[in-house]
Amino acid sequence: MADEERVVRCYLDLDVGDPEEHAERAAEHENAAQYIQRKGHQLGLDTNLKPSELDEEQRDLVREACASDPEFGAVVFDEPEPLRAGRLVLELFAGKCPKTCENFRCLVTGERGVGKASKKPLHYKGCRFHRVVRGFMMQGGDVVKGDGSSGDSIYGGKFNDEKPGLKLRHEGRGTLGMANSGKNSNTSQFYLTLAEGPLKQLDGKHVVFGRISPESLPVLDAVEARAFAGGVEGEEGEQPAVPIVIAGCGVLGEESS
């Protein structure tokens, strides 16, 4: 019984946003800060002010001055939101679904190298959540193509469903399950549920093998909100408006629940 309750704790550090766009906005924010500090007195500004503390009239003055000064150029006044949305801690039901959980564990550590057929790293680091459906789920883990059309596993491609995982229910927000294309077609793709209540339509069709730890649920909330910033949801309402990337991942430890 103790072995059935074995839990492995893993983590996914998620970045949300376009890195190039973020770097550009950060540079423009620094432009504004540097101008205020070095030349703000020419506009009658307190040089100790932060860009975000300027009123609209002051912002217009700085914007116009920087546009005509080749040393500075474009500016933004509000500091861009950090790319790092936070850490999701996942509790894997290793006692109930040992094969599925071992596959996931190895994919977060990257310890198995590259796939024999795919020749791609068996590692979630750098993978995107390519599909996010508001109030339903977010799906990622395609270590081969990154777009949800493929996947791989430490077992050399597809592996079978574990019956105990098929019996577990999607009981609420933060359930961790295996994405598939039918019976016994598990690879590396997985999903996290975003629905507050049960998702009975998924029960018995997908292997449930873990959950988000309660302390990580606020991070999930933040990721879902930022995924649809500005109301853009892709052509079919399933694409995040900005990239959601697993920037880091690993194992935290093992315990009995």
Residue ranges and their predicted role:
Residues 1-257:
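Cross-family detector of peptidyl-prolyl cis-trans isomerase
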